[in-house]
Design a protein with these regions (language model features):
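Extended, histidine- and acidic-residue-enriched regions that form the cofactor-binding/catalytic faces
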Residues: 1-143, 150-166, 172-367
């Protein structure tokens, strides 16, 4: 494939899409009119009220026999991951969680219309792990990283044990390294065939948060800013965003700007924001407002295209997994673990069927 076939270009030279199924999907959304974007959102019933207390939506609010029946049609489960963190005077400390839960609820609604509803489960980290610079900030509750990892591994194991062996964790908080560590620890410890994925949803559709392009946000995605507040205005119930209380604040950098990128890697800089500490003040001292950016310029319309993009991308993720591994099947045990197929056979049976064994009966492995 030549260079001209590798990339799908746009009217902005800094924004290109890879010529793959994913890239072509993103390019399609990029080229859509505002009316077409509204039609995508309508497919997913965006916006809608939160469904956490609505029967037959989350695993935890669906009666058991329905959970099992649905899993036999679609055994992918998506979980939102967030935190409790000060997001300024104008919005809520659960913003990261609610962004993710509203997104995955939309994916569930759309797949349910197709008769193959993806499973969704409650947020396993409602308080969250945090980077060092969050310490001491009122309104932010920090869980130690090792506790968060262990908690996530336990959730992964419990879901796997119940037949949910394809898991996707959608994150909107500065803790991706903790989620990645949990994935690897789960596989170290249990060595079972599974597909477990984590992603920062905003980074997954980063092109749609580039500042100053295509009627989108005008400032880089950071924290409680124009980007996050716009998403909240589109997705959240009335009263969870109050622009009249919005404040503007920015981080003081000790080093020249250009090395460390923002939350969505908008500038293609050499390093992610999370790859250093100490080169800027901690939040309590540097941005006590709980904001990095200019949330007062937020509008729900600015979030429509990125939300359409993540909804369609997550649907594609589910489709790709199930196309390769239909419900009840997993990757080849002897290719993705050091256990034998015979050893794992009882553990891979339908839970509670004759001969089935629980994941907790497996001989422990790991480092």
């Amino acid at each position: 494939m030549g260079n001209n076939e590798l990339w799908l270009t746009t009217e902005y030279p800094q924004i290109v899409f890879e010529n793959t199924e994913v890239g072509r999907l993103k390019k399609k959304i990029w080229d859509m009119s505002d009316g077409e974007i509204d039609a995508v959102l309508k497919k997913y019933d965006i916006p809608s009220l939160p469904e956490v207390g609505l029967a037959d939506t989350y695993i935890q609010n669906t009666v058991r026999h329905k959970v099992i029946a649905n899993r036999k049609k679609n055994d992918v489960v998506i979980l939102p991951v967030g935190c409790t963190e000060n997001h300024g005077m104008h919005t809520v400390s659960g913003l990261d969680t609610f962004m993710c839960s509203q997104i995955i609820e939309g994916v569930r609604r759309y797949t349910a219309k197709q008769g193959r509803a993806v499973n969704i489960a409650y947020n396993p980290l409602p308080y969250g792990a945090h980077p060092y610079h969050h310490m001491g900030m009122p309104g932010t509750i920090i869980i130690p990283q090792h506790v968060a990892v262990e908690y996530l591994v336990s959730v992964m194991a419990g879901l796997w044990n119940d037949g949910f062996r394809k898991q996707i964790y959608i994150n909107n908080h500065g803790q991706l390294w903790v989620l990645e560590a949990a994935v690897h620890e789960f596989f170290y410890r249990y060595q079972v065939p599974a597909i477990i994925q984590v992603m920062d949803w905003h980074r997954a559709v980063r092109e749609f948060f580039y500042p100053g392009v295509k009627g989108q946000v005008n400032t880089p995605f950071v924290h409680a800013d124009e980007s996050e507040t716009s998403v909240g205005m589109l997705l959240f119930p009335e009263g969870m965003v109050d622009l009249s209380a919005a404040q503007e604040a920015y981080v003081k950098n000790y080093l020249p700007v250009g090395r460390f990128d923002n939350s969505t890697d908008s500038f293609h800089r050499p390093q992610r924001w999370s790859e250093s500490e100490g080169h800027f003040p901690i939040t309590l001292k540097g941005t006590p407002e709980g904001v990095v950016g200019a949330p007062a310029s937020s509008t729900a319309a600015k979030a429509k295209r990125p939300i359409a993009a993540i909804l369609e991308y997550l649907t594609l993720c589910v489709d790709q997994i199930l196309d390769k591994f239909p419900a009840g099947t997993v990757p080849p045990a002897e290719e993705v673990t050091q256990r034998t197929a015979a050893e794992l056979a009882p553990y891979l049976q339908e839970p509670q069927s004759p001969g089935w064994r629980s994941i907790y009966a497996l001989p422990k492995t790991g480092l």
